[in-house]
């Protein structure tokens, strides 16, 4: 809550700041996913829309901003793959193919190690969900090089196909 308030203040002071808009969107998405996905609470409508709009604004200002592209791709993916059609329509629609394409583009190496890792983890997760095991294994091997102590990645690479997501 405090982080979202700080992000809102930053956006109020600098409404054309793509980074502040990204953080507002990302923090709202984290809240929605915690409430809905982890806790099972059916709440977060306003936070979802604030996230979607602020990420869209961030990308309008900085179309190549990798972290905003990744967060927005997650919205497209989850709305298209996890929501019933009517709910997906109410949430503004999603696009799984676009989400996978954007995540794949974002998961190319770059100067920003953190943004690259975030995109690569996202791509790996989507590949597992899509049962693209060969692609997921390639992504996991790259992640294992970056994070050799990550037990989930190590298990996936060792198994060759399975993940704790299954």
Write out the residue ranges for each language-model feature:
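Short coil/linker segments at helix-helix boundaries
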Residues: 1-64, 70-122, 129
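Terminal, low-structured helical/coil segments at or just beyond the last alpha-helical repeat
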Residues: 114-117, 126-166
